[in-house]
Amino acid sequence: MNKIVFISGATSGIGKACAEKFASFNYNIIITGRREERLSVIKTELENKYNINVLTLCFDVQDRKLVFEAIQNMPEEWKAIDVLINNAGLSLGRDSFDDSNLDDWDTMMHTNVDGLLYVSKALLPNLITHKSHIINMGSIAGKEIYENGNIYCASKFAVDAISRSMRVDLLKYGIKVTAIHPGAVDTEFSLVRYKGDKTKADSVYKGFTPLSAEDIADTIYYTASLPKHVCINELTITPTRQASTYYFHKDL
């Protein structure tokens, strides 16, 4: 019987790369996202390429009602979840605290923090029953702040704290909890942050080789593939040319 992985925010970037990676190891995949057409395309691609089954759930993780309805209405055969990857997240803007946009703050906190909590809480009865593995997508920005990172950093510090709390509170159920903290990864992240400004987005990765979504997916799969008695609590992963949130060695 195939194992099942649930991946939030799976229509692009790290989430999509995780779906591909786990599918290649014969997992059946539950993918969620806001773009229904993208979910359908990915479902078809993965099922045809790997001969596995894919369930798509279209919702915005900010919407608690939709999250709980979608998860509670999943077919029974999809509820035996082995791995949950809380990947949905984003950054909007890179402005000083005094110049930041309140709507951007709300979207980041509701997506990065509330969304993770809603998905985890909705799935928790199933996760407890199956002694599942929860993998939360943090960030190096959740370990160390940087200039004009303010609320994005705050949201990822919260993910780190939530992961630590989960690890303690859910230990009695045999649930593993892992937090993954990437540095610079070349995905849609910067394009979203800079609201479609490709010049600004591309400049983030100039002068060095950033991580790829596949690098992170490989790492996540490794943590999920370890024996039941082994839990990697957290991993911080950066490009070789990145030493911290703000220090890079770039060829300019």
Mark where each language-model region is:
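Conserved glycine-rich cofactor-binding loop
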Residues: T11-S12
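C-terminal helical subdomain
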Residues: A179-I180, T199-T245
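Conserved glycine-rich Rossmann-like NAD(P)H-binding loop of the short-chain dehydrogenase/reductase
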Residues: Y27-V41
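Active-site helix of classical SDR
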Residues: S120, S155
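The beta1-alpha1 cofactor-binding region of Rossmann-like NAD(H)/NADP(H)-dependent oxidoreductases
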Residues: E37, C58-E69, L102
